[in-house]
Amino acid sequence: MQVEEYLNDIAEREGTVHLTLIDPASQSPEAAAEIAKAAVAGGTDAILIGGSTGAVGVALDQTLIKIKEQVDVPTILFPGNAGGVSTHADAIFFMSLLNSRDINYIITNQVMGAPVVYKSGIEPISMAYIISEPGGTVGWVGDAKLIPRNKPEIAAAYSLAGKYMGMHYTYLEAGSGADRPITPETIGAVKHVLGDNKLIVGGGIRDGKTAKICADAGADMIVTGTIVEETDDVRKKIEEIVSAIKK
């Protein structure tokens, strides 16, 4: 089964997919593998690997190798640039940062990375990436024109543009470590125009209650990353979030 099909099937059967994001720059490959193992034990459906800075080269490859030794769920690249591609992953979110002011994040990095993805056989999953306030590091690095929190219609317009350009997934991002997540109003407005296309929401989600609010508003997939770096019990925290968003 292809990774995209796997994720879509979980979304249909269980209501919401949970993805754990691990940044190779934040810990050793061995520590990353232990986090992934605990997250899978807690019920996460797949592991995202990537970050805004430093998630490239040997650190990325070794992190993927160690993670795949410990878990059986899909590993999906979440690249910050063309250097964030590794042949050791199962799939890649092949994305365009639609609200960037920098053409490198809209298409140039994608052009540079596409031949590598093609030759490696990694499964590409097309995705519109949209960053909302507060934006965090990724908003700064990606030079994003942040979507205002109180303007869901703007997020919906960007999402619709991505859908019409053929992108299967839309990712609404508040930024890693954000102090608050995407608003339910924005999630609902975006899901309304996306229809059957899948909506991913990440940033500022630290507990089951917040995750459930996002899922109930229309998120098909929930991403948590910073929390697995901060908590003393990864499995317990992931269990809390997963139990809140599944049917």
Curated annotation (Swiss-Prot):
Q: What is its main location?
A: cytoplasm
The record lists sn-glycerol 1-phosphate as bound by: 171-177, 203-204, 225-226
Q: What Pfam families does the record tag this protein with?
A: PcrB
Q: What Gene Ontology cellular-component terms does the record carry?
A: cytoplasm
Any Gene Ontology biological process:
glycerophospholipid biosynthetic process
Q: Record's InterPro entries? A: GGGP/HepGP_synthase_I, GGGP/HepGP_synthase_sf, GGGP_HepGP_synthase, GGGP_synth
Q: GO MF terms on file?
A: magnesium ion binding; phosphoglycerol geranylgeranyltransferase activity
Where is the protein localized? Cytoplasm
Q: Which cofactor does it need?
A: Mg(2+)
| Positions bound to Mg(2+) | 23, 52
Task of the protein: Prenyltransferase that catalyzes the transfer of the geranylgeranyl moiety of geranylgeranyl diphosphate (GGPP) to the C3 hydroxyl of sn-glycerol-1-phosphate (G1P). This reaction is the first ether-bond-formation step in the biosynthesis of archaeal membrane lipids.
Task: Tell me which family the UniProt entry assigns to this protein.
Answer: Belongs to the GGGP/HepGP synthase family. Group II subfamily.
Name the NCBIfam families on file: GGGP (TIGR01769), GGGP-family (TIGR01768), PRK04169.1-2 (NF003198)
Annotated protein name in UniProt: Geranylgeranylglyceryl phosphate synthase
Q: Which organism is this protein's natural source?
A: Methanococcoides burtonii (strain DSM 6242 / NBRC 107633 / OCM 468 / ACE-M)
* Organism placement in taxonomy: Archaea, Methanobacteriati, Methanobacteriota, Stenosarchaea group, Methanomicrobia
